Curated annotation (Swiss-Prot):
The basal body constitutes a major portion of the flagellar organelle and consists of a number of rings mounted on a central rod. In Gram-negative bacteria, at least four rings, L, P, S and M are present, whereas Gram-positive bacteria lack the L and P rings. The rod consists of about 26 subunits of FlgG in the distal portion, and FlgB, FlgC and FlgF build up the proximal portion of the rod with about 6 subunits each. Belongs to the flagella basal body rod proteins family. It holds the Pfam family Flg_bb_rod. One of its GO terms (cellular component) is bacterial-type flagellum basal body, rod. One of its GO terms (biological process) is bacterial-type flagellum-dependent cell motility. Structural component of flagellum, the bacterial motility apparatus. Part of the rod structure of flagellar basal body. It comes from Proteus mirabilis (strain HI4320). It is found in: Bacterial flagellum basal body. Keywords: Bacterial flagellum. This is Flagellar basal body rod protein FlgB.
Length: 137
């Protein structure tokens, strides 16, 4: 019984963590939309969640984010990401080499935000259900 609860919450915790990391990556893409040569990045959420659930977290062996220009806005100083960062293939590259498509980034940012909120709502409803069962005895 407790294993099922632990697995359910572990899955939700990992999903929230990955959604949070993706949100930071998308925010960095948006922040660097006017930076010449900036390459838009993202993660494959489904593949990363599957990998995390099968193998567990990689801990300190994660991918270290680096800036290729001093004008890039960092995601976070010393930020370590366990997910594999992918470079987004642009539909049309700008003349300065920047691959950020603001329409796509805003759409992905909003979609990820809605899914994050849905995950939080789902977890809250699970906790409330368990609390109701425990209170009723």
């Amino acid at each position: 019984m407790l294993d099922k609860l632990e697995n359910t919450f572990h899955f939700q915790q990992e999903a929230l963590s990955l959604r949070n990391k993706r949100q930071e990556i998308l925010a960095a893409n948006i922040a660097n939309a006017d930076t010449p040569g900036f390459q838009a990045r993202d993660i494959d959420f489904a593949a990363e969640l599957k990998k995390t659930m099968e193998n567990g977290r990689t801990g300190s062996h994660g991918l270290q984010l680096t800036m290729t220009s001093e004008r890039h806005i960092p995601i976070k100083p010393g930020y370590r990401l366990e997910a594999d960062l992918l470079y987004r293939v642009p539909h049309q590259t700008s003349m300065d080499g920047n691959t950020v498509d603001m329409d796509m980034e805003r759409s992905n940012f909003a979609d990820n935000s809605v899914k994050y909120q849905a995950d939080v709502t789902f977890i809250n409803s699970q906790v409330k259900s368990m609390m109701a069962v425990l209170q009723q005895g």
